[in-house]
Regions:
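Low-complexity, Gly/Ser/Thr/Pro-rich intrinsically disordered linker/tail segments
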Residues: 269-280
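Short, well-ordered loop/turn sites that connect or cap secondary structure elements
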Residues: 60, 66, 134, 226-228, ...
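Boundary regions of SH3-family modules and the immediately adjacent low-complexity/disordered segments
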Residues: 1-41, 57, 64, 68-73, ...
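Active-site nucleophilic cysteine motif
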Residues: 173, 185-204, 208
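...with weaker cross-activation on analogous glycine-rich loops/strands in unrelated enzymes
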Residues: 206-264
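A generic structural signal for residues embedded in beta-strands
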Residues: 45, 74, 142, 234-235, ...
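A structural connector/turn signal
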Residues: 61, 129, 221-225
Length: 280
């Protein structure tokens, strides 16, 4: 089988597309020339949190992370690491291959952890040993039986950790209050600025991209004077959520945790004028 390029080469965001030079995904055949094309293979994260790195090395920089149950489409395996893309936000990185498993069909009912952390019990009892703690946002497939979900792959989670969770961005962000700042993090165990707002808006069904510059391309620009609670405020390399017109909730390296503080203080430290964007 062969493909013919449809026109001049286009630029595809390398953090979201396998567009070369070594790996080009099959979906880009006709747009990007390649000696061979690869069709990503669907796998799933089997550990509570899994760092996505810039290269196939445990010492490589963390660029994001997968949470338990999130799908990860891989195109290559090298040195015990898999190169792939998260289905949650299309972000590309390398993860430990041994922390992945074959993904089952996605046509079943999926449950999401809505607690800050949910104990994964060895049996359907609150007195059973805890084999892991699953973070907010973890995705679980399984069968509800009484008060517990029997998780596909093993373990049980209490149904109260899967229901009646935050229904808006403010409540979701509040779950992260005091969480450590962690470059590449997306959970209450450690989160960065773009990861925090991504997780907060996700409970409203709003899909934010992973990095601040990519998120800045989304939403609607709003004049600073017209800002309101729920808007996102951007600076170069940073973002936070307005909880009202003058206070910002954000994960930051100044306090090394998630805090809510005066917007004016953040702007003064940033040394740049903020840009406000609205997401509805």
């Amino acid at each position: 089988m062969s493909w013919v390029l449809k026109g001049p080469a286009q630029r595809f965001e390398p953090r979201e597309w396998f567009a070369g030079p070594e790996v080009v995904e099959l979906a880009l055949a006709g747009d990007v020339g390649a000696v061979r094309y690869v069709d990503p293979r669907p796998l799933v994260c089997t550990v509570p949190r899994l760092a996505m790195r810039s290269g196939p090395d445990a010492a490589a920089e963390a660029v994001s992370e997968l949470l338990f149950g999130e799908r990860f489409d891989i195109v290559d395996v090298k040195q015990g690491f898999a190169l792939g893309r998260s289905r949650h936000d299309r972000y590309i990185g390398w993860v430990r291959f041994d922390a992945l498993a074959l993904a089952s069909a996605e046509d079943g009912v999926l449950h999401h952890v809505v607690a800050r952390r949910a104990p994964l019990f060895a049996a359907a009892s609150i007195k059973a040993p805890v084999v892991a703690e699953l973070p907010f946002g973890a995705r679980l497939a399984g069968r509800l039986d009484g008060n517990f979900l029997a998780v596909e792959g093993g373990g049980h989670v209490h149904r109260r950790h899967l229901a009646d969770g935050p229904r808006d961005r403010f409540a979701a962000a509040a779950l992260f209050a005091g969480a450590p700042y962690l470059w590449g993090g997306r959970s209450p165990d450690g989160v960065d600025c773009s990861g925090l707002v991504q997780q907060a808006l996700a409970v409203e069904g709003i899909a934010l991209r992973r990095d601040t510059d990519l998120q800045r391309e989304q939403g609607e620009a709003v004049k600073f004077a017209a800002r309101e609670a729920g808007d996102l405020v951007f600076w170069p390399g940073h973002v936070g959520l307005l909880v009202d017109g003058d206070r910002l909730c954000h994960a930051n390296a100044h306090w090394m945790k998630v805090v809510t503080e005066p917007l004016a203080d953040v702007t003064a430290r940033a040394g740049a004028e903020p840009e406000v964007r609205r997401f509805t």
